[in-house]
Swiss-Prot record:
Belongs to the adenoviridae pX family. Residues 1-26, 41-70 form a propeptide. The role of the precursor might be to condense the viral prochromatin for encapsidation by virtue of the two basic domains. GO terms for molecular function: DNA binding. The gene is PX. The record marks 26-27, 40-41 as: Cleavage. Keywords: DNA-binding, Late protein, Virion. Pfam families: Adeno_PX (PF05829). InterPro entries: Adenovirus_late_L2_mu_core (IPR008393). GO terms for cellular component: viral nucleocapsid. It is found in: Virion. The lineage of its organism: Viruses, Varidnaviria, Bamfordvirae, Preplasmiviricota, Tectiliviricetes. This is Late L2 mu core protein. Its main location: virion.
Length: 70
């Protein structure tokens, strides 16, 4: 049986999670857009390429099963 102890230590700079969600209102939207454009075209493609590489085995197995059934 495991025993877990938890302690609450007050941290002065931490204010907890904010209750309200403002979304991307005002200057935040512009800042996010500028950051996205600043990275360039290639960094935007990297997650898409990684997802495609990860999906190759699944696509190949479906194609093999379809070929075996015919």
């Amino acid at each position: 049986m495991a025993l877990t102890c938890r302690f609450r230590i007050p941290v002065p700079s931490y204010r907890g999670r904010s209750r309200r969600r403002r979304g991307m209102a005002g200057s935040g939207r512009r800042r996010a857009l500028r950051r996205r454009i600043k990275g360039g075209f290639l960094p935007a493609l990297i997650p898409i390429i990684a997802a495609a590489i990860g999906a190759i085995p699944g696509v190949a197995s479906v194609a093999l099963q379809a070929a075996r059934k015919q």
